[in-house]
From Swiss-Prot:
Highest taxon of source: Bacteria
Name this polypeptide is given: UDP-3-O-acyl-N-acetylglucosamine deacetylase
Catalytic residue list: 265
Task of the protein: Catalyzes the hydrolysis of UDP-3-O-myristoyl-N-acetylglucosamine to form UDP-3-O-myristoylglucosamine and acetate, the committed step in lipid A biosynthesis.
Lineage start: Bacteria, Pseudomonadati, Pseudomonadota, Gammaproteobacteria, Alteromonadales
Record EC number: 3.5.1.108
Enzymatic class: hydrolase
Family named by the database record: Belongs to the LpxC family.
PANTHER family per the UniProt record, alphabetical: UDP-3-O-ACYL-N-ACETYLGLUCOSAMINE DEACETYLASE 1, MITOCHONDRIAL-RELATED
Name of the gene encoding the protein in the UniProt record: lpxC
Cofactor (UniProt): Zn(2+)
Disulfide bridge positions per record: none
The reaction(s) this protein catalyses: a UDP-3-O-[(3R)-3-hydroxyacyl]-N-acetyl-alpha-D-glucosamine + H2O = a UDP-3-O-[(3R)-3-hydroxyacyl]-alpha-D-glucosamine + acetate
Annotated source species: Shewanella piezotolerans (strain WP3 / JCM 13877)
Signal peptide: none
GO molecular function: metal ion binding; UDP-3-O-acyl-N-acetylglucosamine deacetylase activity
Amino acid sequence: MIFQRTVKEMVKTTGVGLHSGNKVTLIIKPAPVNTGIMLVRTDLSPAVEIPAVAEQVRETTMCTALVNDDGVRISTIEHLFAALAGLGIDNAIIEVDAPEIPIMDGSASPFVFLLQSVGIEEQAAAKKYIKITKPIRVEDGDKWAELKPFKGFRVDFAIDFNHPEIARSQQHMVMDFSSSAFVKDISRARTFGFMRDIEYLRANNLALGGSMENAVVLDEYRVLNPDGLRYEDEFVKHKILDAFGDLYVAGHAIVGEFCAYKTGHALNNQLVRAMLAQQDAWEIVSFEKEADAPVSFSVPSGAVFA
């Protein structure tokens, strides 16, 4: 049987909030079976819990943010959620003492390292998957995103940026996720931004924590980071990383193919909501025998079992 997973023990880190520029402490704790991912704002009294479900995503400008009915928010969840999805973690309590998850280095890699450092524990319940049985598609102008039936999890993703440095890189990628592909090929891809936008954001008290320490920064012609890129195709890979995290608010890993063109946080969330609303287009499945499971899901990507 493919079992549900959580972290073996509590793990803690500190970082900087991308938009506030303030120090943020993040704690990840084990959670019982069928908990899902629960976020907690510990800086509020009493502490406020926000479940990581699609309908709680109410802000998608520059990041994915969970917002409850009282307006309490936790922003920039997508890189942490990509790490949770990529390592197959179903259940966890995420405590944060600020309105945003720390940006770390702008990728999912620090979160992957953090989770692997304490180990991943299998739990005494079957892991549940959302198996796509019919295509679901959302569009916004020329942008679109779609989920289609597929045995496993495959991504077919294209970006289109009119920038000489990005145009030189690969802007279209198809990845059939094997047991190690996420950690090795995707998790280290950093968020990227343009100097002209950063100047505007800072003038509006946003991206105060943004720097070349946690983003790939471009001017009109080139990458400004002294060390350059981590992957030749880091731009499209980071958009895939974002999608990994955005899709995980569906509540379970997806068995299917995710195809997208120029999509972002807003359209990714629209797709998840459209999927959940179209109940004849998917089913919840588990795998009694490991041999029956799609290869992508037989072992969590790069996980270290304690």
